[in-house]
Amino acid sequence: MDYRGLTLDPFQEEAVEYIEDGHSVLVAAPTGTGKTLIADYLIEHILDDGGEVIYTAPVKALSNQKYREYTALFGRDKVGLVTGDLVINRDAPVRIMTTEILRNMLLEGGHGGVMEDVEPDEAPDEAELSDIEQTASPSDSHLPEIERLQAVIIDEIHFLDDPSRGTVWEELLIYLPTRIRILGLSATASNLEEVASWLTEIRETDVKVVRENERAVPLKIYMASLETGIVPVKKFNNLYKGGRGRGNGGKSTRHYHLFDMMQDWRFPALYFIFSRKLVEKLARGLARGDVGRKLSKMADTQAINEHLNAFEEEYPEVLSPRDKATLRKGIGWHHAGIHVALKALVEELYEARLLNVLYCTSTFALGINMPARTVVFDGLTKYNGVDVVPLTVREFMQMAGRAGRRGIDEVGDVIVRQDFDDYDEVQPLLGRLIAEESEPIESSFNLTFHSVVNLVARFDEEEIRSMLERSFRAFQARTEAERLGERIEDKRAENAAVEQQPEEALGPEAMQERRRSRRKLAALERELAERRRPRLWEDFQRKLQFLRTYDYLTAHNELEPPARILRHIKIEEIFLTELILAGHLEDLTPTELFGAMCGLVVSLPRRAKVRRPDDDKWWEVFANFEAVYESEVVVRAEDLVDSETVFTPEVMPLGERWARGDQLNDILDDIRNPTDMSGDLVGCFRRAKDMIGQLRDVYYSDAARRKELTRLIHRVSRDEVEVLD
């Protein structure tokens, strides 16, 4: 079968046939094999039918990338973008949005709290106010946004098990009307059939699974050290077993050694390292050494300069002389903290094949399609904020899968920097990585207080209990309980023959074995009872009791004023609601309010130091906010949702400066940090803008306040914050 002049691979053809037959489909295929072509086909199929489709992505950068791709493919009038930052053509038949936006739309009704594109001096009309008031049920197919919706494409569907965001994925799949088809895409998931069985059960229609295990460009994994050079894993193992170099106190292998060993044909290369500071440091260090001179000879300096000159016309203060010298040698760096415009420049240079080495963190591998000839890992462990932990197979393959460019390379090389000193610790992990023994998707379902109040606003407790029973977490618990029940039956049958014999007929060893069997059976029965506990319902009841205790709900689950506020708050839910109730936002000017929200959305790196504010007013704000932050209600809420409340007061004056119109570089002068933090600050301003949008919904009945907040949103939506990155 051909599509767009391409002969489809068998797995693509299988998925397309299921789509044509009207099925929902889950597709698991390695990075670079063409999963997105299936999504393109579905979109085209639905457009031809006069319907609508939503494409959800886990991150805004990927949403923005898909928007650019689909406007080029289907035309600007056919494609819309809806994220927390931007709303473009929201009524288009093809809409790209983050997963959270669609979930909010289904849970809350209306636009899910997304800002309309209104002019700063435009007051909200009655229709706009009524959008906020809608109370349609999550499964109500008559929401205006989904009346003609035929399908939802969920990219990176394995995010179901993400600890911080997986609940949103589950809620979306539970609330989505069953008439709407699903296309789920994943690079790797060992139990996708289990996910399909769950969806088949709750959606009452057969959900198909399509798998592709072969890579379009096969991977070859190498180990590299000064003593061995770049060698296949098997040879590295043999050298290690032979004792070569082990424990001899040899010189450690550095990043530049690897590039010195690499032949020209192995470039371009992505170098993954899990530290922002080292991403920048290593890139600049490589440019200064002998390897930098080698790479400089390979670089197209003239073409790079053309890009740099165009960039500097628009952003004259972003690049330092050292930055430009590094980029001119075809060496780049990329992480979430760098200036958004610089990030876009680096991606532009890389796509134009003008960078031969790109140092990056794992965020570069998430969804964005930028393959390389070679992928290099600085190591196979990373710091997760608490401990140094091994990479999961899924994380490793997400990054390793960038090696090998389809249609250009016959093979993609994956090189791991590894000395003999700690190879004992790495070997078991390496075996799992090479075998691609991907971890199963495990539910991380955990309702927020925002979800709880929105559910009780429109459902009784039995309906909510039924909804919780439809979650993937409940499905997995039931499945495990069934398996355990079968084991118990087998154990009982196994014990039966021995149990029938009188004790006097048994010898000491047989008696001991019978006691062991009884204990084992009792343990299995206790485990089964534990598995059958309605944990989600118990958790829901605890949160419900919390909301009653602190007067958010009546004893009959009617919404009190705090809960009516909470229905619109999605970030730092209880903390922000309590700040509103305490009146601490009332006396703040709009610019101060924006600054205050910045303190609730970002945590600074440990080494970052922010200049103390000169204005005494901020010390009073800090004290007021801190009193709420340390209050019993906020502390107890934090325990119940098992996440830490964000409170970073030193960022507040920086946010106020942005709202006043100060330039990003001037604001950055007030922060001392070893790495570029402009990207962090821009991300902070964007999330604070989201919070202002939520406050705007809270004040739906106060036209003057809403108008003021709308103006504030337009004021902060400028320059870097408005960049479509």
Give the residues covered by each predicted segment:
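Motif I (Walker A/P-loop) of helicase-class P-loop NTPases
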Residues: K35-E44, R165-E170
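Conserved C-terminal RecA-like helicase domain
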Residues: T56, N64, T71-G80, R276-V357, ...
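Conserved interdomain linker/interface between the two RecA-like ATPase lobes of SF2 helicase motors
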Residues: I174, R181-L183, T188-T200, E204-G285, ...
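SF2 helicase catalytic motif II
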Residues: G113-E133, D140-L183
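Conserved pre-motif I regulatory segment
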Residues: M1-A28
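Conserved segment of the helicase C-terminal RecA-like domain
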Residues: T374-F377, T381-Y383, V389-L429
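Non-catalytic terminal extensions of ATP-dependent helicases
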Residues: A127, G332, E351-L355, E442-D725
